[in-house]
Amino acid sequence: MEKSYSASYAAAGVDITAGYRSVELMKQYVARTMTENCIGGLGGFGGLFELDCSGMEHPVLISGTDGVGTKLRIAMLLDKHDTIGIDCVAMCVNDVICAGAKPLVFLDYIACGKNIPEKIAEIVKGVAEGCVQAGCSLVGGETAEHPGMMPEDEYDLAGFTVGVVDKAKILDNSTMQPGDVIIALPSTGVHSNGFSLVRKIFDIDNNPDVLKKTFDGMDKPLGEALLAPTRIYVKPVLAVMDEVKVKGVSHITGGGFYENIPRSLKKGCAARIAKADVRIPALFDVMQHEGGISEHDMFNTFNMGVGMVLTVAPEDADKAIAILKAHGEDAYRLGTIVEGDGVELV
């Protein structure tokens, strides 16, 4: 079928033929995420997915949505767009596994000043890679041109996921008690939170060349370190949940330790963490030094090298860590549960 073209719409700043070209370029990446549960292909009004609940007594759907924030500015300055989609997927799927759910489908939304097909395809390439890492299918998406509202070379990216969990297996912290062990799963870097402060620390908007600098203690340029994709923890964490009773999971995002760890704690329980036990990457030390940021603000803003924490009974800790290591996670004991409230960094 011949594709339509509107000269009037193009004159207004929206090139629908660029949209067609984007879809053609991204098809190869989307195909990597397709499974036998996916019905139909790209181009429908909705993404169809056949839900297989075999083995579940009472399936419950869980949804999550998020974006990448101003990490996008780093991608734009470096003109590297093929990993930022991984971040988008990670921010969504890492949230839903905190309830014990398996992500099933993902959808993305890209708003841009001008649809440049090659750039859009690179973004979706990253989204598809994130879906492969998470074991979910990219069943739909939207790319919207916003001429006159956004500069031509800028874009925003957000995503949405739906997962499923058996109601009896929804994560429950009711058995959490003092003595339980908190396990850390290392991050790949800053992940996708705190970039407004990062940009201020290094004055990136006014001095983008700083992204090419390799600071003392770091083994790569600042820009490369900042753009490292958010780690996706779905498969290793679900593997642990299959064999060990996990009492709590926190995805360490905006708000750092102080805001996110308490979200999985039982009332009357606190997380006691020795600062000396936190394996802090050099990037965070550089950020703290360059910005003159207090230790409290660092732990209250950034993940400090810990992207996710799990809480288990002490007798299950070694087994949980072994499973995580078998799935490529360099997990370690971060702290313990004590009586109290919130997070105690000692």
Regions flagged by a language model, labelled:
Residues 57, 71-72, 192-194, 242, ...:
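Short helix/loop capping segments that flank catalytic or ligand/cofactor-binding pockets
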Residues 2-12, 28, 119-137, 150-157, ...:
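Glycine-/charge-enriched secondary-structure boundary and capping motifs
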